[in-house]
């Protein structure tokens, strides 16, 4: 059942029909040319994942559970020294990088634009992207690359302390029109809104060159801190808008099922993820819900990033909005079953078969 966007629709009354049903509704779903290439623009950060034995330790080190705090190099070192007894893993990260890696595993042609240092972390980061079949478009500068310390509570919630390093300092003229012309969709990380000239210029350039612009709001603190700027840029440039429940509430002041309707009036399609309840998608006078997949989360790190990958992959192959969201839900269901933002290599053949079933 489809619903008029101008009416309030309680979440309990939103239903997602079968994929077959939505295949018959392609005229509602913004079907686009197949085999679109997607490039991401985001903070290039090495993820250091720490599995906390108890969440009380967060207050001891002065970080609020669930927050994303910016830290300097000295704070980063102090936090990691305090948590030396916690199990840890390391992997190239940053929200958009996670999304581009997942897109490449699905078979999409994906690229990533970021800024790194001339250190070992930067070299490792670039090599890891190449191995994942993501085209790296890096701007290099002297000094240390950025990193994100991800502290995972026993209930799976993530708390982040981020040392950005050079990651957010990309200048507008460091992204050429020649690079952008090689792609059809650009996916921009909301965290980069701190660099207004970069985001504004890149969005304007992309639209002028005919690219679709996708934006992830990234964090409710980002929305609260840059709301006037977002209210200007989103209606003007953004086609596809991703947010979670708290980010949508920060932007609109509304609960999720109302927020998605309000957001859809500003963009081509709005997606609000709502955790274990799934996601809400609104576009072109319609609103519908997609069920969540996966069991009890071990770690929610990367759930939104992988959802975005699934959705954008669907769009790159001409799927409907609903099919795209179902692919996103599938990827989210897999990544919450592991520690870290990346799905294990061994799971991708199984995922690819599920994606084929959704599309067919």
Predicted regions mapped to residue ranges:
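Substrate-binding N-lobe of the ribokinase-like
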Residues: 75-147, 352-358
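Conserved phosphate-binding/catalytic loop of the ribokinase/pfkB sugar-kinase fold
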Residues: 137-139, 150-193
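Extreme N-terminal basic, low-complexity initiation segments
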Residues: 1-9
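Conserved phosphate-binding/catalytic region of the ribokinase-like
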Residues: 32, 38-50, 58-65, 69-70, ...
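Hydrophobic beta-strand scaffold residues
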Residues: 110, 136, 213-214, 270
């Amino acid at each position: 059942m489809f619903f008029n966007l101008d009416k309030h629709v309680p979440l309990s009354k939103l239903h997602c029909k079968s994929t077959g049903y939505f295949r018959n509704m392609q005229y509602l779903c913004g079907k686009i040319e197949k085999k679109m290439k997607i490039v991401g623009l985001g903070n290039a950060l090495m993820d250091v994942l720490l599995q906390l034995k108890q969440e009380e330790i967060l207050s001891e080190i002065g970080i609020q559970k669930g927050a994303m705090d910016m830290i300097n190099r000295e704070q980063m070192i102090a936090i990691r020294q305090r948590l030396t007894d916690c199990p840890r893993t390391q992997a190239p990260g940053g929200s958009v990088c996670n999304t581009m890696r997942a897109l490449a595993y699905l078979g999409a042609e994906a690229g990533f634009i970021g800024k790194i240092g001339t250190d070992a972390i930067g070299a490792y980061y670039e090599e890891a992207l190449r191995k994942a079949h993501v085209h790296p478009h890096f701007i290099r500068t002297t000094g240390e690359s950025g990193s994100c310390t991800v502290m995972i509570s026993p209930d799976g919630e993530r708390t982040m302390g981020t040392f950005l390093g050079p990651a957010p300092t990309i200048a507008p003229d460091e992204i050429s029109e020649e690079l952008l012309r090689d792609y059809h969709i650009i996916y921009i990380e909301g965290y980069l809104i701190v660099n207004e000239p970069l985001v504004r210029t890149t969005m304007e350039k992309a639209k002028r060159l005919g690219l679709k612009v996708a934006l992830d709001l990234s964090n409710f603190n980002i929305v609260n801190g840059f709301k006037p700027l977002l209210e200007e840029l989103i209606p003007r440039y953004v086609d596809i808008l991703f947010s979670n429940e708290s980010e949508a509430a920060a932007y609109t002041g509304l609960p999720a099922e109302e927020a998605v309707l309000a957001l859809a009036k500003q963009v081509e399609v709005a997606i609000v993820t709502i955790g274990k309840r799934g996601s809400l998608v609104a576009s072109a006078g319609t609103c519908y819900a997609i069920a969540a997949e996966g069991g009890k989360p071990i770690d929610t790190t990367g759930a939104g990033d992988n959802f975005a990958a699934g959705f954008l992959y669907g769009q790159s192959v001409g799927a409907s909005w609903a099919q795209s969201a179902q692919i996103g839900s599938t990827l989210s269901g897999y990544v919450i079953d592991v520690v870290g933002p990346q799905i294990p290599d061994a799971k991708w053949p199984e995922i690819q078969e599920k994606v084929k079933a959704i599309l067919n």
